[in-house]
Curated annotation (Swiss-Prot):
GO cellular component, one term: cell tip
Alphabetic keyword roster: Carbohydrate metabolism, Cell membrane, Cell wall, Chitin degradation, Chitin-binding, Glycoprotein, Glycosidase, GPI-anchor, Hydrolase, Lipoprotein, Membrane, Polysaccharide degradation, Secreted, Signal
Topology within the bilayer: Lipid-anchor; GPI-anchor
Name of the protein in its database record: Endochitinase A
Main location, first listed in the record: membrane
Lipid-anchored residues (GPI-anchor amidated glycine): 936
A molecular-function term among this protein's GO annotations: chitin binding
PANTHER family: ENDOCHITINASE, ENDOCHITINASE A
Amino acid sequence: MAPKLFTFVSALSGLASLASAFHAEAKSNIAVYYGQGVNQPRLAEFCAETSYDIINIGFINSFPEQNPLTGLPGSDFGNQCWADTFVVDGIASQLYSHCPNIAEDIPKCQAAGKKVFLSLGGATPTYWFDTIDASTKLADFLWGAFGPVTDAWTVADKPRPFGNAVVDGFDFDIEFFGSKGYANMIKRFRRRFGEVPDQTFYISAAPQCSIPDEQLSVAIKNAVIDFVWVQFYNTPGCSARDFVLGTKNGFNYDSWVEVIKAGANPNAKLYVGLPASGAAANLGYYLTPEEVKPLVKKYMDKYPETFGGVMLWEATQARNNQIDGVGYNEKIREILYDLDPNHPPPTTSPTPTPTPSTTTTSTTSTTSTTSATSTTSTTSTTSTTSTTPTTSTTSTTSTTTPTPSPSPSTASSSTTETVTPSPKPSPSESSTTSETSSLPSTSTPVVSETPSETKTPTSSSAPPLSSSSPVGGSSSTASSSTSTPSETPSASSTRAVSETSTHISTSTSSGPETSLTGSSTSVPATSSSVPSSAISPSSTPVISETPRPPVTSSSSSTFVSSTSTSTDCSESSTAIGTHSSSSISETPSASTPAASPSTSPETTKTLTVFPTPGSSVSTGTTSASTLSSSVPATSGGHTETSTVSTSSANQTPSASTSKPLIPTNSASSTSTGSVTSTPSAPGVPSSSAGSDETATTSTTDSEPTSTSSGSVTAKPTTTEPATTTTIIVTSYTSICPTGFTTITTTITSTYCPGTASATATAIAPTTDVPGSGSGSSPAQPTITADIPEGWTTTVTVCTVCAATPTTVTLTLPPATTTEESTSAQPTGEVPSSDGSGSGEVSTTTVVVVPAPTGNAGDGVPAPGANVGEEYTAAPGSATTSKPLIGGGASGAHTAYPYASSTFHIIPSASAHVPVPSGSGSSPSGTQGGASPTFTGAGSRYDVVKGVPALVALALSLLAVL
């Protein structure tokens, strides 16, 4: 015991020496889950290992809506918390209040260069949002409880489960009911992150490998996520095992890259999620290090900008899986470092949102005399470079520093502007303007900035702007024009700057076109006795934004979209759509400098483009939508009103799936409307010399406008022999004068596939394929069947079967008939996708136990789930690579195709049993270090294995009777 303790203390003391900077943009990082391991060590022991870069502590496994009496979420961190929970008005909550080891170890991990995230979700269907507002409130609570400590939170004595420890981000391992709330929640987190600008926080997500992932596809498409570690295990057809086997159209990392590129953050890093041992996932999904290396090499080389590394489920499994004397995680680290010798990269961590870049430098020199009349001529040249990747964010910063001189003849000022769009090449542009003028004079610089996004090479030109000023008989003229031929978004600017400037900035977007106009006035002071000028400019930028519709089709591209999502409170669960444009959000902000010779006015404009996917749809028609916004010019604030009007959007996408699409329902829906948005989100002013101006955006949205019509009609069929005759020799139990007796009988069963029928209903999805989420793979049905035709079940009292009269249930054959026709289809309980389930499952008592064909206990779909039929989804259905159980436009559930079987288990009376949450009603710390029942992103197949055990128990009871 003492040597072990000494080793642990030594490991902790060595954390500082092992510290290395975390690099979010690296392609050889390892992320791991912690909190659900069997007899897991302390967090600090894993942080003492050099292999891990990100550690997700899981889970927050229920939300306030599931705990209405306390209004607090629930948690489960395994054996790392005491049994105490927070109490609200005398009622104990599900949120553990004392987790001292984690509270002590998080700062140590961070000192060692690790990032620690708090993970939400897990493998139990005990969490969901009923409203969007609930997701906002939960984000605020988690930020207060696990984010930076604030005085307001402390004074209110609100929960801090990890004490003063602060997590580095939040992870979403959402496996049930994920269609509502999560995109909004991530956006809310992003806003709260802005409250601590000197610290970087991250968002990660762990979807299943099927595309679209039914739980997180909406969030990935609409909210900025930094890391996506796909669970490439426990789901047949898209797992890493399919890569090893060479399955055609199997391992789908390439498709996930496309999902990332079409999402809200095309610069997100994509990790390969793998089980850390054979026991961490279903049988067959574990990959040896020798199998992992070629996979990592191929995709690290193919997508060096997107590949982020490997995610492992989970830390304790990795440590226990010793290979050549080291843990599995160390083997994976060796592979990553071998293939990426430059790790860690020399660059600094990027900001979470993408920022492409161009640079414009403008230098102005002015020569002044005391002449009463002057003429100012300004010319400017512009070089424009276009970037190929989609621009996600454009940030423009302009700084002007006029420098007065005591000399009567010269004054100079310089302007440097940096525009930062990012995916890649840094296009640069420069312009130099020189002018000679006589004092007093007034000149007007013109800044014209025209980002354009077009389908075909076109050019847009800003009309010349001219101004004249009759001060002292002087006049000035400035003109600018911009020509931007490009196929992809590009930014160009023409800039003419003078010493005493009225700053005019015009920004034109080819989708919704807007102009951004700012003005500032500088007044030179002259001395009447000395022919010299002392320049003391006073600058007051005023920003106004005037909407303009696209001028012509040749110089701008029209926004065309069939589905749009524009605000936090409006999310679309449609995972696949065709869009030929982007939705643009912009947040202009400006700073108002003090009037002094060293004034540095700075104007920042952020333009975020959210591209939408344009694949997986074979036919479709959309109509143009026009987005316009008007912004009044004010000196103290910025208000933006946006209106989205959609005339009519009709979309008829069609898709097909290579695996059964189970619902056989026909439904159509049509909705037409318009979205009026008044953005309401606090802006972040950017200032270099102090500013009291705040850009405010206020948003109120109805549902995005889209009109769609379609029907889903999928009719699974099977091909079987015309008639199957089965002769079964079986036995049943009856009563004779001396007690129970067993009678052997013969049953001849004739099965005709043409007359077979099947039905399926849906309820709590607790027996999904482990780790694959609700809906992304079929639930494990409760198998039932009719008793043979003519057989009857009776209840009687037997006086000779035991010491006392005993009530027994008997299933007896008919007296004269031995033939019956059996149903080829069992009835299964499959999940509902509305997120409103009660979270309970049924436990059944088995009466008749003829076994069905197939293996229902190995964590894979029940018999017939993969019978090889190919179904085609009607227009309007989503593409999926896995069976879709139940669901549809009307919520009806239809039959699941199964192969024929002679008998099925017959459940009798049911009793409702609550679904275990997390590792049970209390953490494993109160159970002597026992393993949690469910393991989040890991395997859930142990639950499925309980079905055969139940059958065996029932048989043994019958035998005793």
